[in-house]
Amino acid sequence: MLPFLLITRVRLSDMNTQDSADLNEACNLSTSDAVLALFQNEPALRLTFGQIASRLDGKHPDLSGAVESLVESGLLYRAAGKRYALPEELGIFSGIIRIRPSGNGFLKAGEERIEIDSRNISGALNGDTVMVRRFESRTHGNMCSGKVESVLERSRKGLSGVVRKAGRGWIIDPVDPSLPRRIPLKSESGSDISEGRIAFALLDYSGRKLRAFAAADIGSSDSPSALVDSVVLDHALPDEFSDNVLDKAAGLASEPWSIDGRIDFRDLYTITIDPVDARDFDDAISIRTVDGLRELHVHIADVALYVTGNSALDTEARLRGTSVYLPDRVIPMLPESLSNGVCSLRPLEDRPTRTVIMKFDEAGERVDFSIVPSVIRSDRRMTYEEAYEYMNGTGSDPELKDLFGILGGLSDDLDRVRDARGTLDLGSSEYRVEFASDGWPSGFRHIVSDSAHRLIENFMIEANRAVADHCMWSNLSVLFRVHDEPVEKSEERLAEQLYSLGVKLPGGRIHNTAVLRRILDGLQDSPLRDLAVEYILRSLQKAVYSPSNTGHFGLALRSYMHFTS
């Protein structure tokens, strides 16, 4: 509806007439569209229902229902005196509220962030779609604040939490820290739930205060698997596939596929490099020298061969959006017969792939590339630890020594090219939680970003860059990964934060990749480096997916997308 309404607004504003009824009839608008077009044509309008009916000359059926629908969806606002207006004209904005564990929240309204004190949340929960009135006065730090006026749509029907006895009744403490504590359980619902058990409760929004009633017992709060189950239920993660989807996947996985139309790379030595606990293998790499150029091959599993547009599998994958990795399980986006089967590049098994072939000169500059359908047979599954042994020269296999000599040399050259281009490297410390055999966390392990990790990162970035360039040059409608330049206000705050760390700042703009790199290089051996990285990250815009290619600030690239995972 929105693109149509935008076009309608432009047309109405270009017409030199006040006869809204004739305009609406000429444009053949629905009742809701006609009402909204009336206000969009004259944004300052404050009309009663009778005045709206008069303006539209009674030409539209069910006007009352249309107006109420617009109010419920947040496109119109019912103000004092039962007058209707566009919300933004009254300083009211709609969007998804985010609530911190402290109870305070915020809402993004365009480029502006409206801070909301816990006293002004008005019963909204984290993730709800709300309408927020922005206050005219600003708080300290020149931040704008506001109050939730109404909840347009609830983000959840229930929650997981620990059941507690409270006097003669029961309460539930949600596992999600952004939700309010001590939510009352309806008295009749606590009889089959005991103290300290984890339960899933359905929420009751009908009263003035939030209440719940227990729907299912999940397990003991002393059970790690029950705690994971509570997270699955709390986020409404679909942990099972329908029989129809499973049957479709199994049928496709067992069907033979043809090599016709694919370039055969099965004789090219190919490896995968993944974490030691990886459950599936999405990408593989090969390299060879052709006419004095290094020819890098990045192979990606050809999932589209099995998952066609608008099929049952495609619909299910869209609903799930991603695979979810939990301590004791994976909830895959596709059934395991695909995700962990024919779409996983297992060693010594033929697999259909899409291959990005990139040629690099002796300096590491890309001179040519192509994208082709292919077939590969991975020769070896390697972990990062194994790959690192060959990167630092301690590996024992002669064939792999030669292979990593070429791979490592190209990766080093790509590092130099990226440095010269002005890429911003914000690599910070990464830690992984380790679990004991009983399922409880046993400690943290520092993940070292060594040359093996860097090699895969470099090669995947180059493949993504090549595919993005191809899509841009071919004018294809795709989602790019864009990262806009920082705004001036965040640069001022960053300068203050870096100064507080004792960093000597150069004159001029600091939101320049070369300047930021020099600052971080100066903190290379300092314990303050991770904090500086955190400050810089907070000052930058978030990288997002967009059909509009505006470039990638952090990578200093004119086009970038996620072709690889």
Show which residues each predicted segment covers:
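Charge-lined substrate channels and their catalytic hotspots, especially those that engage the 3′ end
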Residues: L6-I300, A304-E349, R381-M382, E389
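Electropositive polyanion-binding surfaces
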Residues: S54, E195, S206, P224, ...
